[in-house]
């Protein structure tokens, strides 16, 4: 997103190749292959045991010194990097048919001395029982491509999610935007009920909206909704497909935190 000139918090990426190198160095790649080759994903205890073995290996193995130094050096370059968000970013070899949204962990308000641990914990979350079961359903169980994004922590006034087309009713003429005060992790996890808006992709007009708390006004103004719409269109143009986006606003500035393909759309709509 940064390469497209879109507004994102400063940060850096621990590339998927670093995870692969880590697994090769600690013997994890061979162990994971052995554990998952004949795994019966319908056997809950077997899946939990496999997950525990893999995750324990990852979190108990120190990062290679060159990688640890590179991560800490990149962290020191962040102007306001005292606290960061450490976000998982997993993509299968066929990323348009398997979205890993919600399968891995992300961490907020991470201090400098905890960054390396949180990177390993993000990697380990790729092998949670839920994630193993999900990838088995998508026939990508052996895929171990996992990047980690480290961003300056944004103390947001408002946060939410945006779908650049309507994924529920399969409407490609409108966007669905949800927003709530403060940080947005509660929306993503389902703990917070946000405002819900449906806006026209063409002109930004608000077609529908729902505010769950009748005692407060809308979280997002028409101007903010239109700003998000414009960013959504730019994201689609950059990635080439409808997007599921996490966003936030700080002092009136809209920032994009994460974007992934929407994988639940039908062929027509």
Regions found by a protein language model. Give the residues of each.
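N-terminal beta-alpha lobe that positions the nucleotide/phosphoryl donor
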Residues: 1-149, 158, 220-223, 230-240, ...
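Short hydrophobic-aromatic micro-motifs
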Residues: 8, 14, 174-178, 188, ...
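Short beta-strand scaffold segments in enzyme catalytic cores
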Residues: 160-163
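Short beta-strand segments
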Residues: 87, 151, 176-178
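Conserved catalytic alpha/beta cores of large enzymes that bind or transform nucleotide phosphates
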Residues: 174-251, 269
């Amino acid at each position: 997103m940064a390469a497209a000139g879109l507004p994102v918090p400063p940060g850096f990426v621990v590339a998927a190749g670093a995870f692969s190198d880590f697994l090769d160095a600690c013997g994890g790649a061979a162990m994971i292959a052995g554990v998952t080759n004949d795994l019966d994903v319908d056997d809950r205890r077997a899946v939990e045991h496999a997950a525990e073995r893999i995750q324990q290996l990852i979190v108990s193995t120190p990062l290679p010194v060159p990688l640890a130094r590179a991560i800490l050096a990149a962290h020191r370059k962040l102007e306001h990097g005292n606290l960061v968000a450490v976000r998982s970013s997993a993509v299968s070899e066929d990323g348009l048919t398997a979205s890993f949204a919600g399968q891995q962990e992300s961490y907020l308000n991470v201090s400098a001395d905890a960054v390396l641990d949180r990177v390993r914990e993000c990697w380990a979350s790729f092998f949670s029982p839920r994630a193993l079961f999900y990838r088995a359903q998508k026939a990508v169980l052996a895929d171990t491509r996992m990047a980690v994004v480290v961003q300056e922590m944004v103390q947001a006034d408002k946060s939410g999610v945006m779908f650049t087309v309507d994924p529920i009713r399969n409407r490609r003429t409108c966007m669905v935007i949800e927003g709530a005060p403060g940080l947005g992790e509660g929306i993503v996890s389902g703990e917070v009920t946000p405002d819900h808006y449906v806006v026209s992709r063409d002109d930004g007009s608000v077609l529908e909206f729902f505010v769950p708390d009748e005692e407060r006004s809308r979280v997002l103004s028409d101007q903010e909704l239109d700003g998000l719409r414009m960013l959504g269109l730019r994201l689609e143009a950059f990635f080439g497909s409808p997007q599921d986006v996490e966003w936030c606003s700080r002092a009136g500035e809209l920032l994009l935190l994460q974007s992934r393909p929407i994988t639940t759309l039908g062929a027509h709509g």
